Amino acid sequence: MGHAEWIGRTNTAVARSAVGKWFRLEGSGHPRERKGAYFFTELRAGLATFFAMAYIISVNANITSDTGATCVCPAEDLETHCNNNTEYLLCKQEVNRDIVTATAAIASVASFFLGLLANLPVALAPGMGLNAYFAYTVVGHHGSGLIPYSLAVTAVFVEGWIFLGLTMLGIRQWLARAIPASIKLATGAGIGLYLTLIGLSYSAGLGLVQGAQDSPIQLAGCASDEFDSDGLCPSYAKMRNPTMWIGIFCGGFFTVFLMMYRVKGAVIAGILLVSIISWPRTTPVTYFPHTTEGDSMFDFFKKVVTFHPIQHTLVAQDWNISSNGGQFGLALITFLYVDILDATGTLYSMAKFAGAMDERTQDFEGSAMAYTVDAICISIGSLFGSPPVTAFVESGAGISEGGKTGLTSCMTGICFFIAVFFAPIFASIPPWATGSTLVIVGSMMMHATLEINWRYMGDAIPAFLTISVMPFTYSIADGLIAGIISYILINGGVWVIAKCTGGRIVPPNRDDEHEAWTWKIPGGFFPPWLVRAVHGKKDFWRADDEASQLDLGVMPPNGSMSSGSPEQVAEKAVGKY
């Protein structure tokens, strides 16, 4: 038996098993089996998704540990004192290792169960943008932000359960649709610029820019031990930091070239290249200097494969919010709103990419279960000490490899589970290795600006304010507030003037170029499962049969792949693989 024949027979055998029927693989005999869904193709797609998003393990750990989490640093002169406090820095290292384990663990659980229960080829992990807002606005560098870390993870925990309630009642879909399209598109672009600024800064990036005295920001690029008494980079040392240049060329341009040639795992390849260059202790770019902190990091790195239990960030919630109620509420609302936009937008786009979208209702197969898993995993992740979990657009890498079912996500989840035991490697990835990654991710998120309606000022100005205010205030919440309020004031004012003048005074291009907006949702306000339950359908969690008549990428009951001899089915399976 040749290799191709063995693959075909295995695809056929798995398709006809209970696993194949559960995931609706082609050839399973399921009345709604998915075209082109084969066992080995799904596994390969899951690997592609993992390598496309594995960078989140180290990036999320670097960003989140910048808060100090539960490590205590004296309040006086936070920046100077904390950066030179050996005990505090050693504690931060432990937090970084905790978050590495937490990120891999929650990504494993969330991705596996979303694939198993929702049967979608979409992976979940702590979200980029949300983790930056969590770390640098809500908690702050060294805990200098709005609320302590313990309250921040409490807000994330509560947000997850609120998200679950909104999902079950259908309000989640209404909120996502009620926000004007220009604001939703601008939110993604604004977060992209926000991530870019983080990637260029010192805390979790290349160290190319920093704050200044005479201007909001200035060029930097010098080693941290060359800062002057004001903590600024002197002119004679600018752009002389070798770690910055390694990050730019090996982590930036090298990664871009790989991406241009569609090399799988390009992002993680760039990160690993910079990391490998930075690991030897005898070079000027080493991540393990001969100091107390460097020795501690190197000792952990040498373990290579080990399980690091979560210690500092496990169940760190503090339920006494009396002294920070206002800021706690603001953080909670922002987490909830951004998560609704992020998860909804990503899941919708990935479902459409996979061919599982109902254009009439703007819903997709398994949507209720997908959002339920996402919401529950947000709360579980907060117990590990992680920022909110969300769907990753990198799931498109797996879908482009042929992933069509939840088996793809299950494979990605298994890969993240294996990564839990490689914490020493992921915890030893320096920030300059991931800085260019943040810039690249930010540039990809700017693609959303192409769809913004720039022709009408009532749409363009709120969108522009949303995009620009986010990075300049270092806050996603402030950008959203600026965009929404300006949209209400501008378009509300136009509406009032039109009403008062009987429609005689309106902008000349309003009717032709203003984007359509309505709070009404095609297909009804309530989620399909609730409608089915009210109508007395016993298995209300199952989609109606007429969905199979839509072009959703599923086979009709008499699909050609569910008939024929095993040899014919195997031959077709090999061809698709």
Swiss-Prot record:
Give each disulfide bond as a residue pair: none
- Name the keywords, alphabetized: Cell membrane, Glycoprotein, Membrane, Transmembrane, Transmembrane helix, Transport
Give me the segments passing through the membrane. Answer: 104-124, 151-171, 189-209, 241-261, 265-285, 328-348, 373-393, 413-433, 434-454, 476-496
Check the record and name the InterPro entries matching this protein.
Answer: Azg-like, NCS2
| Membrane topology note | Multi-pass membrane protein
Q: Where is the composition biased (Low complexity)?
A: 555-566
At the top level, the lineage of the source is Eukaryota
Coiled-coil residue spans: none
- Sites of glycosylation? 62, 84, 320, 558
Q: What is its main location?
A: membrane
The record's family statement is: Belongs to the nucleobase:cation symporter-2 (NCS2) (TC 2.A.40) family. Azg-like subfamily.
**PANTHER family listed in its UniProt record:** XANTHINE/URACIL PERMEASE C887.17-RELATED (PTHR43337), XANTHINE_URACIL PERMEASE C887.17-RELATED (PTHR43337:SF1)
Biological role: Efflux pump; part of the gene cluster that mediates the biosynthesis of notoamide, a fungal indole alkaloid that belongs to a family of natural products containing a characteristic bicyclo[2.2.2]diazaoctane core.
What is this protein's record name? Efflux pump notK'
